[in-house]
């Protein structure tokens, strides 16, 4: 288990392009939410699900649910809600549409957090991924609140406002399943591709 880290699954998206709640989609016999919760449970004993539409999620009874503080405020609102509900020093925040994340990925991110205020991976395409990242509750909660009150909706703005350790994909590429870590499942076509990969993972 990782010390001083609480895990959060963001399940509050509207899933308009998918047409159904992504956290309830099944892959390899488990919902996306169950898959992510299983990997998080290998590194932390405390897991919470953030979102306003979580009542029907099929997850272990020890997992708590917490609502958004700022309703309909997108991804930054979800990160803010996680930080608000976090009882540990760090929040490990994972979006529900990353079904191929692993506990080894989480351990790799956590291993470099010392002296930083956030840890965020860089995808293979060079784009930072704020929705599979570690946030130190102080100062990130305070800054997230300030950003939201200024009208900001993108969590990348939070990462750019604190001391962030950017983890290059080359630092993660040797981990098993690394090529799929950040496969974002947004559409039925994405889900079809993920289902094919799911039989391999």
Predicted regions and their residues:
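Nucleotide and nucleotide-moiety/phosphate-recognizing core
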Residues: 2-152, 160-179, 192-199
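A residue-level signal for conserved active-site and pocket-lining positions in enzyme catalytic cores
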Residues: 159, 187
């Amino acid at each position: 288990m990782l010390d001083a880290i609480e895990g959060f699954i963001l399940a509050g998206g509207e899933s308009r392009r998918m047409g159904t709640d992504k956290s309830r989609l099944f892959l390899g016999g488990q919902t996306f939410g169950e898959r992510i919760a299983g990997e998080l449970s290998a590194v932390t004993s405390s897991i919470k699900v953030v979102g306003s539409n979580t009542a029907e999620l099929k997850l272990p009874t020890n997992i708590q649910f917490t609502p958004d503080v700022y309703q309909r405020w997108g991804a930054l609102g979800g990160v803010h809600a996680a930080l608000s509900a976090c009882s540990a020093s760090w929040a490990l925040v994972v979006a529900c549409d990353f079904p191929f994340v692993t506990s080894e990925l989480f351990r790799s991110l956590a291993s470099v957090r010392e002296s930083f205020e956030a840890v965020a991976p860089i995808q293979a395409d060079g784009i930072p991924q704020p929705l599979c990242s570690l946030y130190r509750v102080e100062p990130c909660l305070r800054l997230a609140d300030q950003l939201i009150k200024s009208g900001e909706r993108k969590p990348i703005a939070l990462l750019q406002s604190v001391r962030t350790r950017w983890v290059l994909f080359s630092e993660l590429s040797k981990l098993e399943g690394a090529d799929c870590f950040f496969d974002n499942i947004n559409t039925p076509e994405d889900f079809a591709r993920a289902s094919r990969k799911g039989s391999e993972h």
